[in-house]
Amino acid sequence: MENLYVKLAAYREVETERLHLRPVTLEDAPAMFEYASDETVTRYTFPTNHSLEETRNNIALFYLASPLGRWGIELKENGKFIGTIDLLNLDLCLKKGSIGYVLNKDYWNQGLATEATKAVIALAFEQLGMNKLIAVHDQNNPASGRVMAKSGMKYSHEEPYAMLDLHEEGRMVTRVHYVLTKEEYLAEK
């Protein structure tokens, strides 16, 4: 039986109505830096990038070194690179993993993160044969939770003292967990 990574190799690109999910390249660095250097965007995701070189290094480290299950989000209408979505932490035995995403704030509140998330969820359950997907967000970032809910994921629980905040020294993060099983997905389809 093929493992998830072999199956993922066949899905380097995914199309939705408005989006083209595709591999991230070094040429995407300026567009990624546009949002990766914005503290409003990175507040609940990753350390803010301080130079284009840092963004290029991150692309090489995270997207070029391990490209499977990682997509750049590009607008079909104009080819603009606006964010990323990842299928991470794959458990090959249990066939489960997690979804993470980040979007340039100029494209927030347009349903684009939800559209990309729904596409990755469909791929995970319909093509890859996964059993369960998990997504988490900082309690102080409810907009991310709305993306998860609109994508069909179900609230699971809150995890107090989950980690230290990357941006606010001393603040302990409560993470909110959302889950979707294959059975739940198929029942709602």
What does each model-found stretch correspond to?
Residues 40-61:
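Conserved GNAT-fold acetyl-CoA-binding loop/helix
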Residues 51-54, 63-65, 76, 102-104:
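Juxtamembrane/interface motifs at transmembrane-helix termini
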Residues 1-39, 43, 70, 74-189:
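Acyl-donor (CoA/ACP) binding surface of acyl/acetyltransferases
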Residues 60-72:
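A short helix-loop-beta-strand connector motif used in the catalytic cores of GNAT acetyltransferases and
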